[in-house]
Amino acid sequence: AAQPLRERKTWRQRVQQERLEYLGMLEFFTRHAQLRVPHVLAPVTAHYSWSKGLKLLGLGRSQLQLLPEQGMRLDTDALESTLEKCRRERQPVLMSVAVLGTTEYGTFDPVDGIVAARERAAALGLGHSVHVDAAWGGYLATVFRNEDGSLRSRDEVARGYHAFPAPEVHAAIAALADTDSITIDPHKLGHLPSGTGAFTRRDHRV
């Protein structure tokens, strides 16, 4: 049965007072010693700022698990096996990271494969988010969209280019709609002012 309004309000307040963002990392894990600090899974090609970010958040650099690459793209088999290991060991995962345009090579991680891995893991009880670091290559996604925002087919996009896009690039762009958050810096490929960079999130409450 639904709680009376007064009890519901009290319960919500109690929940809020136990949240990580209210207590802080140290107090939260002191109170809940049975819990483990979550991992962040990212490709070995990820920008060095990921290491910095985990330090600043207080999660710790050791929670950043760098996964191997295949052809300078995240190896999805390695991701799947890492997620399975985390599930078996009851190790929480905060997010898997895809890079859309690596700093050194401009390669796109298989976002579609990473999203599929998230869905399979979630079905087994290991829920986590997928974040796309599209700081470098995100602006290129505009080439793949019609004016109304709908996705253009690979053949439509390819008409304007000689050998672009590869099927895996189109699949990665198409899968952006299924991710949880994206960072983008249009001042790079878009030649726009630096202040146009953004962090976008599917859940607008964030």
Positions of PLM-derived features:
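Conserved PLP-enzyme active-site core in the AAT-like
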Residues: A1-H204
